[in-house]
Amino acid sequence: MPVGVPKVPFLNPNPDPEPDSVEEELDSMEEKATWVDLYNRLYRQRWLFLGKDLEEEVANNIVGLMIHLNIEDPFWTQTLYINCLGGLIIPGLALYDTIGFVEPDVKTICLGIAASMASVVLVGGTVTERCAFPNARVMIHQPRAKEFDDRFSDLNLEGHLFLQLRNCVTQIYIHRTNKPAWVIIADLERDTFMSATEARTYGIIDGVYAFEEEYEEWS
């Protein structure tokens, strides 16, 4: 039987008058604690997660959370943890644009893998705030289209749209990594896998976490 999402206590951050004793303080904390599911608790700390394929529902949920948290506190840095094999182009670009739209910095962290459109989201984080764990992997490649409709007019329209989207993704990598266009275009022609250190050298991330609190910055 599935265990489900665990619940954890959450205390209202608004301070109340200090209690007269330790016992009163403990009683007050127990009364005010609200039990919420684990992800809700993490969201309140501005820790967001992309752990599924990038489809409309997944992207819309994260976009909605980011905008809500931006309204609630426009100065509290948001952190997006990424372990994703990629997904659809349009939802991925929607998430990428939202990262640039919200007022607070958005730290993007790769754990596991950030492949395809997930690597676009990773590189879209605030510069100096994009990082990965030592054993993470990053993969970039050009967008791939599904089968087109047989009708010529639809084929022409969809082909034109696909070329626009492909150019958009290419320009994102060029702008965010500061790599020459010819390097990006050549690397997108195939599945290009990178270790965390290689992704840092490439310009997709800015640093690699080493051990717990230690953070190795690129210089």
UniProtKB/Swiss-Prot annotation:
Single Gene Ontology BP annotation: protein quality control for misfolded or incompletely synthesized proteins
PROSITE patterns given in the database record: CLP_PROTEASE_HIS (PS00382), CLP_PROTEASE_SER (PS00381)
Keywords: Chloroplast, Hydrolase, Plastid, Protease, Serine protease
EC number: 3.4.21.92
Localization terms from the record: Plastid, Chloroplast stroma
Catalytic residues (positions): S116, H141
Annotated TM spans: none
GO annotations of cellular component type: chloroplast stroma; endopeptidase Clp complex
Region of interest: Disordered: 1-22
Entry-linked SUPFAM superfamilies: ClpP/crotonase (SSF52096)
Principal localisation: plastid
Record-linked Pfam families: CLP_protease
Catalytic activity: Hydrolysis of proteins to small peptides in the presence of ATP and magnesium. alpha-casein is the usual test substrate. In the absence of ATP, only oligopeptides shorter than five residues are hydrolyzed (such as succinyl-Leu-Tyr-|-NHMec, and Leu-Tyr-Leu-|-Tyr-Trp, in which cleavage of the -Tyr-|-Leu- and -Tyr-|-Trp bonds also occurs)
GO molecular function ontology, one term from the record: ATP-dependent peptidase activity
Subunit note: Component of the chloroplastic Clp protease core complex.
Biological role: Cleaves peptides in various proteins in a process that requires ATP hydrolysis. Has a chymotrypsin-like activity. Plays a major role in the degradation of misfolded proteins.
Family: Belongs to the peptidase S14 family.
PANTHER family assigned to the protein according to its UniProt record, in alphabetical order: ATP-DEPENDENT CLP PROTEASE PROTEOLYTIC SUBUNIT, CHLOROPLASTIC ATP-DEPENDENT CLP PROTEASE PROTEOLYTIC SUBUNIT 1
Protein name: ATP-dependent Clp protease proteolytic subunit
